[in-house]
Amino acid sequence: MKRLFTIVFALLITVASHSQEKTIETESVTLDNLIMFIVEHYNIQDDSTETKNITFLIETYGDDFNLEDKVILKQAFKLLAKSVTEDDLISIVTYSTINGIALSQAEATDIKKLLYVIEHPKSSVKTLEDDGIELAYEFTKENFVEDSENSVVMIRIPNRESEVANSETTNKKNNTRKKSNVLVLTAITLLPEIIAVIKD
């Protein structure tokens, strides 16, 4: 009888430890809110001593990002690289038009690798898959880091279409882009002030 209780107890402990092992936190943010999300969620001076294993799941709408989206993504990843440590890991998986792993567990401070993926999303993906979202979770589970904060951050880029080589469409987009670029440049110049306000 004692032996039966010992076996049952050992089995319960094993099941409990396996159920707690692979906890993956999920976050979702639109591209427009990405910089603020990074400011709020990643800070090198946090009290948390846990390292981070972050898989960014970025929506794609063509072979490349438009200029405005590239600027936002690059600024966000530059800010992130300053807000994490060398022990933290970042992976990038793309979904929607291009589904695949674009960056596999690089040092979070390696800004060159991060920016290369933003500049060349299609060529960064070596193997195209059917479902990028499912792939991101499978990849994160396979590359789970014990005693680390493992997460998938979905970056949604709504209402974008791939560039069309039509002169009318191009002219309309150029006019819209000029207005959008002014907004992006204004936001980037205000970024240090926003960060200072948040820190206070």
Predicted regions and their residues:
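DG-centered beta-turn motif at the end of beta-strands
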Residues: 56-61, 92, 136, 147-172
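VWA/integrin I-like adhesion module and closely mimicked acidic/polar interface patches used
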Residues: 29-33, 83-86, 157-200
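Acidic, polar low-complexity linker/tail segments
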Residues: 2-6, 17-55, 62-69
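Short beta-strand-loop
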Residues: 89-122, 164-170
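Surface-exposed acidic, glycine-flexible loop patches that form ligand/cofactor-binding
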Residues: 44-48, 81-84, 140-148
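Von Willebrand factor
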Residues: 23-39, 50-106, 113-155, 182-199
